[in-house]
């Protein structure tokens, strides 16, 4: 599961569910609306809102918790209208995306931590970067085929510096 808020809007939250879908609340969690039916696979492990444009959301498929009955996802999805509509944004073989980071100054610069297939070695693991809002992706970090990226943090003083953990 994943959750994110919107700066300046204390009652607006988005929630990516382990059971599937992206949900939205405008009243601090009293009522939730599914805003993604028909767009995603079994689970959402990462969700983020752009600081430079809060209408831009990214959601990554696959649970971030590793256990025996984990469900995989099918890449990354993007909304440019606060969740009213969604478009596939790539990384179809990622299986598990535990973190998505958006450059605070440019919502087209996006980083995705990809854990990959939990049950076998794969070259899909690592950290990916898109400079065009998810149209094209480049792998910028690859530890090895057994260690996927599990978390990302962007330096708030210098968005060109990113910290990643692999496991």
Predicted regions and their residues:
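Beta-propeller blade termini and top-face loops
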Residues: 1-167
